[in-house]
A protein has these predicted regions:
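Metal-ion/cofactor- or nucleotide/acyl-coenzyme-handling active-site neighborhoods
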Residues: 2-35, 39-54, 67, 71-391
């Protein structure tokens, strides 16, 4: 019996030990934890139906606060320089209504109209008599004749022998005609025109008021001169009326070579003395220039022909003379406005300076007469840049 108890007790001990070991083994083996589920995607609720103006834009994250700005001691703070203003945009001025109307007339295709040209030339010759009366000569103004100043009709001048000897022996234009003539005005429109070569290509070139033809102007106005007018006011302003040194005047006259110099000695009584001094100076210095005097009777005829109340400008006088003397007349530098008709830029009064003209001439009215002749194909006005090969 005892041995059986011992065996039973031993078996129980053995089972107990195995149970402890098994329990320990099971407790050390842990199952892997289940995977952590990812959070569901953020779902933005759609706006309820009927919500007008509601946005489907997701709300932005709150801004990350910036660090506080560095505080600089007030003594070191310098104000920022003001911004440099940008230049204003270039504004091209528009042409005024008057210039628009003028250019509408001028822009028509120009063509020489032989019949119109011949009729007008004949009318001018029969009315103004430039061939025989444009210049005071010994042929048309004898000793004892009365010269009536065209600007002072109440002060006639009796021709003495001394005066008579200063007159041209005969009219330099009698029985002379030229095929092409350039009449060069002094308008600022000639600046940068490149018209010099075309001007000089004419057989006879007329210039006004001792206009400069030095090298700096050669490209635009040329230098050929067959006839030049000399207003006594220029002789007084530039050369002190030739009462002092006369050499500067003669140095200035060299540029005109052997041209005729047309002096309005009998327009006003004050013109006579200074015009005579100019003539005597050129004789004393043996100048090749031939001074002659404009005939006031011819100027009165011109004024009546053009029906202008104001005194005619030198430009219109010379254009009129050219229309009698020349088959083809081309005008340059004739533009009475202060804005370029094609480039829309401001113009100087003259191509060589910006001295304003006096109000004794009716420049726009004169230009209107010349523009009408341009439209009729009687003469041609050149505006803008010239093309020498087109002539």
């Amino acid at each position: 019996m005892l041995p059986s108890l011992k065996m039973l007790f031993s078996l129980m001990i053995t089972l107990l030990i195995f149970g402890i070991l098994f329990t320990t083994l099971i407790s050390d083996v842990r199952p892997a934890p289940p995977p952590v589920p990812l959070p569901p995607a953020l779902k933005i609720p759609s706006p309820p139906k009927g919500c007008k103006g509601c946005s489907d834009v997701r709300p932005s994250a709150p801004p990350v606060p910036l660090p506080p700005a560095l505080k600089i001691p007030s003594s070191d703070v310098r104000p920022a320089p003001p911004p440099v203003p940008l230049p204003p945009a270039l504004k091209i001025p528009s042409r005024g209504p008057l210039i628009e109307k003028v250019m509408a007339r001028y822009s028509q295709t120009w063509k020489k109209q032989e019949e119109n040209s011949t009729k007008f030339r004949d009318l001018l010759r029969s009315t103004c008599h430039g061939f025989t009366k444009a210049v005071v000569s010994q042929d048309n103004t004898p000793v004892g004749a009365q010269i009536v100043y065209d600007g002072e009709k109440r002060k006639p001048l009796t021709v003495t022998s001394a005066f008579f000897n200063t007159f041209a022996k005969r009219n330099p234009f009698s029985n002379k005609t030229w095929d092409t003539c350039s009449v060069v005005g002094n308008g600022g429109i000639l600046s940068n025109s490149n018209c010099g070569e075309m001007i000089d290509s004419a057989q006879f070139v007329i210039r006004c008021n001792l206009s400069p033809v030095e090298n700096s102007f050669l490209k635009d106005v040329g230098n050929k001169t067959n006839l030049v007018t000399a207003n006594p006011s220029i002789l007084i302003k530039k050369f002190r009326g030739l009462q002092d040194r006369r050499r500067p005047f003669m140095e200035s006259m060299r540029r005109y070579n052997d041209s005729l110099m047309l002096l309005p000695a009998f327009s006003y009584s004050g013109n006579t003395e200074v015009s005579l001094r100019a003539l005597y100076t050129m004789e004393d210095f043996e100048s090749p220039i031939r001074p002659v005097f404009l005939n006031p009777e011819y100027l009165l005829n011109l004024r009546s022909f053009w029906r202008l109340n104001k005194r005619l400008s030198s430009g219109l006088m010379m254009a009129s003379l050219a229309l009698e003397l020349c088959t083809n007349v081309h005008l340059y530098g004739f533009w009475p406005f202060d804005q370029h008709p094609l480039l829309h830029q401001p113009l100087k009064n003259h191509y060589y300076d910006n001295v304003q003209s006096t109000k004794i001439h009716a420049m726009p009215a004169e230009f209107d007469h010349l523009l009408r002749l341009h439209e009729q194909g009687v003469l041609k006005i050149h505006l803008g840049k010239c093309r020498p090969s087109s002539r």
